[in-house]
Regions:
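Bacterial N-terminal signal peptides that target proteins for export
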Residues: 1-8
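N-terminal signal peptide c-region/cleavage motif recognized by signal peptidases
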Residues: 17-19
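N- or domain-start disorder-to-order transition segments that initiate the globular core
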Residues: 21-47
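Histidine-acidic residue clusters that define the catalytic metal-binding segment
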Residues: 23-30, 87, 169-209, 240-246
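M16 family metallopeptidases and their MPP-like homologs
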Residues: 40, 45-71, 84-130, 145, ...
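Acidic/histidine-enriched alpha-helical segments
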Residues: 84, 88-89, 135-153, 218, ...
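Non-catalytic, conformational "gating/processing" segments within enzyme and secreted inhibitor domains
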Residues: 160, 165, 193-229
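An aromatic/glycine/proline-enriched structural segment found at the starts
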Residues: 173, 177-181, 210-273
């Protein structure tokens, strides 16, 4: 499925960021709370990249399109009584970087820090609060909601955005992957901070998480680090498996008229699972096409 491929892609990107040249050994285990861990020891630079990936993307929106994206956007905007400014300043003082993002099939929260214990430990403690004690302040929720609504109106003027939305809807039909991560103006307007808190409590849990660690730490250190982050989260339950994507019975063409000087053409079909024996042949072939 998409999520497995995305998690492995994230791991690959993190490896490149730490200048790994040889094929690394990927260690994997599960914490007592049920979080899956992927770890690569990379000693080239005195830093560590940590990313917690949750099955909490737009495919989990249901009839509240946009809730996954807004929930993720509010992480780091207020946690454990700290404001967004206080959180950002604290990470900056330690030379650490907080990141987050959300797509159709996953959402994540990340930390990059130097491995000096005087910097790493307090960064991890703050990261744990952002991860597990998000406040979703009303003022920040209203700001992000308005920003999303402005973005949705802007997308209505962009041929690329119009085409992309139509493409996913045509390709996936009633499947959850058809849901646009940004939602619609109607659904986003109807969302409340309470909706975000409920989504957060359901999906940002240990059993629904994959912890990716790459950097200048030993496996023992990584085990302690992963356990501390997983322990900060409620155990929860893993999100149910999404239904398989149906294959197209036949090709079809969709045309959308739009006043523009250029035409945008999107073409595609549901792919194959990563475990398929032909996956890498198709992957390379797709890159050859550009």
């Amino acid at each position: 499925m998409m999520r497995c491929s995305q998690v492995l892609l994230i791991l690959t990107v993190l490896l490149w960021s730490t200048a790994v040249r040889a094929l690394p050994e990927i260690h994997s285990w599960t914490t007592e709370k049920g979080a899956r861990v992927l770890f690569v020891e990379a000693r080239e630079l005195p830093m560590v990249d940590i990313r917690l990936v949750f099955d909490a993307g737009a495919a989990r929106d249901g009839d509240q399109a946009g809730v996954a994206s807004l929930t993720n956007a509010l992480l780091g905007q207020g946690a454990a009584g700290l404001s967004a400014g206080e959180i950002a300043q604290s990470f900056e003082q330690k030379g650490a970087k907080l990141g987050n993002g959300s797509e159709r099939d996953m959402a994540w929260l990340s930390l990059r820090s130097l491995t000096d214990s005087k910097l790493l430990q307090p960064s991890l403690e703050l990261f744990g609060k952002v991860l597990a004690e998000a406040d979703f302040p009303q003022v920040d929720f209203k700001r992000e909601q308005q920003r999303t609504l402005i973005g949705l109106e802007y997308q209505k003027q962009k041929p690329k955005s119009i085409g992309s939305k139509a493409f996913y809807h045509s390709l996936y039909g009633d499947h959850p992957y058809a849901s646009d991560p940004s939602g619609t103006s109607e659904t986003v307007k109807s969302l409340t901070a309470k909706n975000l808190r409920e989504f957060y409590r359901q999906y940002y849990v240990a059993r629904n998480a994959t912890v990716v660690i790459v950097g200048d730490v030993s496996r023992t250190q990584a085990q302690k680090l992963a356990a501390s982050l997983a322990d900060a989260l409620p155990e929860g339950v893993k999100a149910p498996v999404l239904p398989d994507v149906a294959s197209l019975d036949a090709g079809k063409d969709d045309f959308i008229e739009h006043p523009s000087t250029q035409s945008h053409v999107l073409m595609g079909a549901p792919g194959i699972r990563r475990g398929d024996p032909d996956y890498f042949q198709l992957y390379v072939g797709n890159h050859i096409l550009g």
